[in-house]
Amino acid sequence: MDYPPLKGAALAWVTLSLGLAVFMEVLDTTIANVAVPVIAGNLGAATTQGTWVITSFSVANAVSVPLTGFLAKRIGEVKLFTAAAAGFVIASWLCGIAPNLQSLVVFRILQGFIAGPLIPLSQSLLMASYPPAKRMLALALWAMTVVVAPVLGPILGGWISGNWHWGWIFFINIPIGIISAWITWKHLKHRETATVRTPTDYVGLTLMMVGIGALQMMLDRGKELDWFASGEIITLGITALVCLSYFIVWELGEKYPIVDLSLFKDRNFTVGAIATSLGFMVYMGTLTLLPLVLQTNLGYTSAWAGLAAAPVGILPVFLSPLIGRFGNKIDMRLLVTASFLTFAFTFYWRTDFYADMDIGNVIWPQFWQGVGVAMFFLPLTTITLSHMKGGQIAAAGSLSNFLRVLMGGVGVSVVSTLWERREALHHTRFAEHITPYSATLHETAAHLSQQGISDGQTLGIINNTITQQGFIIGSNEIFLAGSILFIVLIPIVWLAKPPFHSGGGGH
């Protein structure tokens, strides 16, 4: 069913409400990360147990996102979005009052599952509310919230956990979610999408939930359990491989599939989804690595690490609306190419990190990386959805967002593991030069002994210095690899075929 575009104040309010929901959901994926030690300690649990606060949300969210297209057809996009925003409020309140870790994990599972439809439906409803000529501007405003929220998450999480009860990490969602749900329902309840009652593909649903759940669990817990040295990780990996392989075969032959894999027959959707997922994998991996380097090796507090990383969100706030307004005059592939080149340049800029560098070495690459971020989400989303019509937008949005989030998790897991293993390699190589016959060792020991430091303490200081250097060199190598990967990704984007327009129709 087609509706005329919204105008004036109604369009502004809907844009605000949909943007708030996206901001709330994306913020919640990162805000708890820095607060895990505080939450675990307050609830009488070990920090390693506290990581389930993050894992539970990501697993439930990963399972839920691909269901969006299926649920939207049965319930209606407006009802589903409003219910998800309202449900997120309730789940956030429950998380904030959780009396123990077990309850918090259960409520985070609920919160993650409910949050699944918010991002893909915000795309679909936003595009249906704007006239075709202005849909790129709508996507630009949407992309701006996706960029800023994960940057603010660690800063807010660290500040709240350091100054208030950790429950406020979740309570801040309550007014945002209420406003979003109320405004959306008020302005869009008469613009509900058509619903279709089709048989439920229970086999596909079960295979997808088990397969994706096992895969996300493997990614979240792999580093902690030393990957495939652990029987649990092997079991999760085999479960994910078998279930997802069978899921793909089953869905391709199913008349009423849970996930419409036929979307991959569209060239632009496939190219856009692949480029977005792989680019986001590299981006998220390094975005997570930077605060770790700053806190564990360069002596930054969590608050200062968050502030040092924050400049990446400055330029997108100003550039995204401009790209949305004038981007339809430029080939989307050129914008993505410029984005990937900017990422490659700023990543290479970081390959000379050293132990006593000042904060400017961190801030300036982050600041200019914002140019790449501004030209990343909007053009790639436009390419991905360029041939989608009406109800296909929600299904395509949910599938592409699922792949993006999944590959972002892969990036975080791979980068954190590589970082530790590169440190171990460099530590071993440096330690080989510390022998009883080493002139450097004797000079260092003599210098430290003059300051009243014992031989045992001297060896400890040297070991810590080697560890610090190993981690810094490891991070420099990862940034270099990220720079190369972004260059390699550029040809993929040029496989997309113009014309590019932001979705093919309304509802």
Swiss-Prot record:
It is a multi-pass membrane protein. Pfam families: MFS_1. The keyword Membrane applies. Its main location: membrane. Disruption phenotype: Mutant is hypersusceptible to long-chained fatty acids such as palmitic acid, oleic acid and linoleic acid. The chain crosses the membrane at residues 8-28, 52-72, 78-98, 109-129, 136-156, 164-184, 199-219, 233-253, 274-294, 303-323, 334-354, 363-383, 399-419, 478-498. Induction: Expression is positively regulated by MtrR. MtrR acts by modulating the expression of the regulatory protein FarR, which directly controls the expression of the farAB operon. Mediates resistance to long-chained antibacterial fatty acids (FAs). Function is dependent on the MtrE outer membrane protein. This is Fatty acid resistance protein FarB. The lineage of its organism: Bacteria, Pseudomonadati, Pseudomonadota, Betaproteobacteria, Neisseriales.
